Regions:
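Acidic, Mg2+-coordinating phosphoryl-transfer loop and its flanking beta/alpha structural elements
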Residues: 143-180
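Extreme N-terminal starter segment of soluble prokaryotic enzymes
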Residues: 1-4
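Short phosphate-binding/catalytic loops that engage adenosine nucleotides
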Residues: 98, 123, 159
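Substrate-recognition "cap/lid" segment bordering the active-site pocket of phosphatases
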Residues: 103-155
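Alpha-helical substrate-recognition element adjacent to the catalytic core
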Residues: 10-112
Length: 181
């Protein structure tokens, strides 16, 4: 059996890093003593929460070309020792005779940035798969541990989903739900 584990929202804190890099390159002018308002990011539709005058094209350029290493490579872990927990889960899955697969939707420069992220935190995994679309993750696994709402919503009936609870996926259905790895 092939058991997949996604990266964003499970191991990597993509949202927090995206927000800080966005604020760095798209600063808002504030009055003296005024603080940046807290964003309530309750979906993964980044255009709902961050302004890009060029829409999806500008967002994709920012994510996958201009700021990939900063966002994907230098993001923190979702929880302390998430990558170590990934390593332990990977070994457990292998010991049980199954195939663990780390799987992520990545494009362009986010691929090497993601490999850097995994490397710098000492991920000891054997199989890493990059896909271009969220629903394509299901083609590589029988069971998938993910926090991504689109991936959860596109689950085929014969597959099993395990949702890692996050503020942007609370309303998504899954076969099983966990707090973290």
């Amino acid at each position: 059996m092939k058991i997949g584990i996604t990266i964003d929202g499970v191991v990597r804190d993509f949202i927090t890093k995206f927000e800080s890099v966005y604020d760095k390159y798209y600063p808002v002018e504030l009055e003296e003593g005024e603080e940046l308002p807290k964003r309530d990011i309750n979906t993964l539709n980044l255009l709902e929460h961050f302004e890009f005058s060029g829409g999806t094209e500008e967002l994709n350029k920012f994510l996958y070309i201009d700021s990939s290493l900063e966002i994907f490579g230098h993001a923190g872990e979702t929880k302390l020792n998430s990558v170590e927990h990934l390593n332990q889960l990977h070994n457990l899955i292998e010991d049980m005779g199954h195939t663990p697969i780390v799987i992520s939707k990545e494009l362009n420069n986010s691929k090497p940035a993601t490999l850097f992220f995994l490397s710098k935190l000492s991920a000891k995994v054997n199989n890493i798969v990059f896909v271009r679309d969220y629903d394509k993750k299901w083609e590589h696994v029988d069971i998938l541990i993910t926090a991504n709402p689109t991936t959860l919503e596109t689950k085929p009936k014969e597959k099993v989903s395990i949702k890692v609870i996050n503020h942007y996926n609370k309303d998504c259905d899954a076969d099983y739900t966990i707090l973290d790895l």
